Amino acid sequence: HLDSNITRAEFAQLVVNMMNHKAVAATMESAGYFSDVADSPYKGAINLLYKEEIVSGTGNGTFDPNRNVRYQEACKMLVKALGYHVIVSDTSLDSYTFLAGTIGVTDNVDSSKEYITVKDMLVMVDNCLDIGRMVPMYYNDNIAPSYIIDEEDTFRSLFEKSTPDGTIKMEGIVTADASTYLYSKRESL
């Protein structure tokens, strides 16, 4: 199970979960950005990430939701979700993959495989939960923002703050963390 691959659609949903945007994704289910996601249970997540320019299609108006996600695609999605795309001048997959390694997204992940596994995804998402997000800051009515790394409001802290008591209720799991919770909920979405 941990060694199985994960699809592009499933990974999109997990990125939305990590960003704590499930409610927003639910409002995006009827958006028609891609012709091949209408029947996908993850269509809201895919559409939201497309609108936010975190994912792109595969050409001809398609997303290919059932294809396994490649390691470099996962790196690009996570780097963009963290906001670091603003410092990437070369938008090749290699550049995003390099940046993902630099900021810690790929720590403890085998980068030699073309496709990521469930285990790789869990490690990458868990890494992202603790990486400071790149956020825009506006100074003196300047229209163009400056960007800073916000070490205080990581996805983990934002996720934990979103629950009433700051805890995450787990069902059927003895020991787990936020990334395990995010993954365990993918089938129920």
Language model: regions and residue ranges:
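Surface-exposed binding/hinge segments that line
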Residues: 119, 124
